[in-house]
């Protein structure tokens, strides 16, 4: 058993008993990274020196009895989360050399706990994409099959956890960017309720939808990480003041009488047979555990994807306007005048998908189209929100597949934006409604992982974790990706 | 086409993006497809529906009027491609 | 055909908060470039704004003082445009739901009171500053980026440049009174843009609107409008048409000229700011703010009449600026003759302020110094006319009055013997006037007093001079 293959709670036991040191744990992961990284390309930056130094500090903490659940645990952070003194590129040429002078609030929280940052992970440029192919630097490969995508946009974080490059990772989810790659890589990924985790320091894609969340190897770890990263932040006006629960207290196997909603809309067109079957088997598992399965309908959910593309692109067009080469980032070398400098800089710095969304968003907000597109989408957002509220009158959580397909081939959808957008069809509605959602591995289809999505009411992460944990205990997902070799 | 070539050119200018003729062509086709797709929303009657700009219904989030130290100028300017005399430098602007 | 002008004004006023609108950087004017900057006001990727509560309170205060309706529900929006002084490439402002709307101010022109409507007041952030001194590029300083502003948009209710001038004066006065802005145009804390069109008298249709920029003082606004209205009428009378454009006031040439702007039409793509939540001003909050409002000009004016016995004219002038009124009250606290103080403020003080173009708080004379000067007169140390000389020196140098009197030897000659010798000499040197006086010409007396003053360089005690002169002449 290699240290790198352990979960947070397993590592925690060893660290607490001082059977291993944080330095040993860190070195084990750094070795693992050297071994598998050339195959999967999950990371943009590896912070080896910083990690080793932090590991020594963590060991000090443990020695002095100042340790907590995450002290000495190595993490990988998506490269759109601001890390002071460490490049934060968003996988964009625009920010290739950008070094933030400040930490995101979540990073501050992790560092305070004594977490060890191993590196920054690859993503679709500015988190726009579902395959991590839109990175300006590298294409991350799915550890289960190197010819396939890990999903996106947090594909680097998902692949890193699947390949044991860290004990846990942080990602961001705007339309499915944590849950979908978690599903495709066979790991646990959660998007918390909008406003639960501070967005301060998360490079904005679509401000009203973005949310930071964890990738972990099991549900228990998800609860542990959540305990640390949530909480009100006075730097984020949309972060909520709620009492901090202990999410590990929800990790119970009992779900008797819990009402689980199954929406027919989540089994619609485009779903692969293998995915459908695996998820239906999972529903049976939950039923056998004593949950009540209720058929529900969320009729407006089919409008979530078009509404999402308008809202997210509109906000993105504004959020990404600041990249002009004046204060930071890429700047053009040759231009005629100021306006030309803006245009050349931005055209050189952004990749195609980013430009496509900026164009769509600018169009949707422009004079004469605002009401027809942006305002319309916000109204549809109201309908979807109400839809979920109605559904949650009948059930406690809603389950379904995270993604309509298993991991697809690299290049397969690269030239068809609409086909790519469909990868998020089951996840975007959750962002539109600001709800929490988790993806947990529930089986394999053709040797590739299938994810089960569990959606809850606002701030009902506890109940989601309860269902996820009960399912996990009853249906252990022990498979490991074979394409990279050398797992447990 | 849901969007014309000249509209694409106009939007590109608004967004401060520069495209070659081929790219304009490509964007016109792709954006048209996407716009056709999002036009699906027009199937819905939203006449009496209020738009939702903020999903979590909170209001009046303020900070007190307190001054805290600003950031060291070296750090503020650290990522600037061009700087001079403690300032960011841009091409000459004629007003 | 007779034409009339239609004038609307947009005023931006910086609010007097300690910190910026969305971050904790100081709002202090000046400072080395980019030293009042943090990741938030620099718009670094990932940063978020948090609204300064005082900004809302100050805007509501201004709204209440300007008779506005205060919105119960208000929100922030993004105004998108690219410019190097705008770090996020959008300005956080308010679009369709401003904090205050539908107010008015009353102005007085030719003895008549006129209401000028205020369409809206909204809050927003200021941009940074571009410095153009460099030869091969422009430099950007973001110290000012994120300083809170209110934008006050008038209805196009003004028809003459004089009305516009009166409106601005009144508005500035009220903003100063409410203590929400110091309104210093030279530091850019008050900025004015104006829209003007002309139309035939009697017509209800509006003419083509011209926007005027680079207006650095209220007088400049007035002069630019005068020029621009004449220009537009001339164009129309010559059969031409007005082209919608932005023109720039050229102060030295005294003309407006077209600005070299980029051709493209603005499309600000406003949308609700997702990073900030709505603002709800409850009735309770509004009343709390109303209670915190300082005394308004007309109340102060009435109080000055009742409490200090000032004539209405004096009270009006003294309260026309809050700073002047404050100065007055500080003086009166230590000096029990309000009318004397008001005479000085309206007289010498105002004259020198006009001459130098300085505001009362930019003058080195403090209320305590003026009181000292007045006491020097009362105690017979200096004469009233010498006091004016001393005051001028105080105004210029900020020296204490007694120091000036000492340094320049300006003390009155109140020694009877000394004065009598001088007077005797004057009588000998002016036989003609003495003759006239004795023949009943009272005016001659004045001339002789003048000669005594001249001989003593104004230092002769006037009462004593009169007394001795009469004695000597009747000898």
Curated annotation (Swiss-Prot), chain B:
Bridged cysteine pairs (disulfide): none
Residues in coiled coil: none
Alphabetized InterPro entries for the sequence: Asp/Glu-ADT_sf_sub_c, GatC
Molecular function in Gene Ontology: asparaginyl-tRNA synthase (glutamine-hydrolyzing) activity; ATP binding; glutaminyl-tRNA synthase (glutamine-hydrolyzing) activity
EC number(s) recorded for this UniProt protein: 6.3.5.-
Keyword entries, A-Z: ATP-binding, Ligase, Nucleotide-binding, Protein biosynthesis
Pfam families: GatC
Source superkingdom: Bacteria
Catalytic reactions on record: L-glutamyl-tRNA(Gln) + L-glutamine + ATP + H2O = L-glutaminyl-tRNA(Gln) + L-glutamate + ADP + phosphate + H(+); L-aspartyl-tRNA(Asn) + L-glutamine + ATP + H2O = L-asparaginyl-tRNA(Asn) + L-glutamate + ADP + phosphate + 2 H(+)
GO biological process: glutaminyl-tRNAGln biosynthesis via transamidation; regulation of translational fidelity; translation
Subunit annotation: Heterotrimer of A, B and C subunits.
Family as reported in the entry's similarity comment: Belongs to the GatC family.
Described purpose of this protein according to its UniProt entry: Allows the formation of correctly charged Asn-tRNA(Asn) or Gln-tRNA(Gln) through the transamidation of misacylated Asp-tRNA(Asn) or Glu-tRNA(Gln) in organisms which lack either or both of asparaginyl-tRNA or glutaminyl-tRNA synthetases. The reaction takes place in the presence of glutamine and ATP through an activated phospho-Asp-tRNA(Asn) or phospho-Glu-tRNA(Gln).
NCBIfam families for the chain: gatC
Protein name: Aspartyl/glutamyl-tRNA(Asn/Gln) amidotransferase subunit C
Species assigned in the record: Thermoanaerobacter pseudethanolicus (strain ATCC 33223 / 39E) (Clostridium thermohydrosulfuricum)
Annotated gene: gatC
